[in-house]
From Swiss-Prot:
It is a single-pass membrane protein. It is found in: Mitochondrion inner membrane. Coiled coil: none annotated. It comes from Rattus norvegicus. One of its GO terms (cellular component) is respiratory chain complex I. Complex I is composed of 45 different subunits. Belongs to the complex I NDUFB1 subunit family. This is NADH dehydrogenase [ubiquinone] 1 beta subcomplex subunit 1.
């Protein structure tokens, strides 16, 4: 069985995990971007009161 036949028969089994990994990577990068914005935002700049939970998690 050649590599071309293997890819032709099992392309779904190759592309679905690759798509999941790529989506996971993009989601993590987007979270980093939003976290950087949150840390600079005027809304979240105040000091938290004692025993107060953060509003973002």
């Amino acid at each position: 069985m050649t590599l071309l036949q293997l890819v032709r028969e099992h392309w779904v089994h190759i592309l679905v995990p690759m798509g999941f990994a790529f989506g996971y990577y993009l989601d993590r990068k987007d979270d980093e971007k939003l976290t950087a914005f949150r840390n600079k935002s005027m809304l979240f700049q105040r000091e938290l009161r004692p025993n107060e939970e953060v509003t973002w998690k």
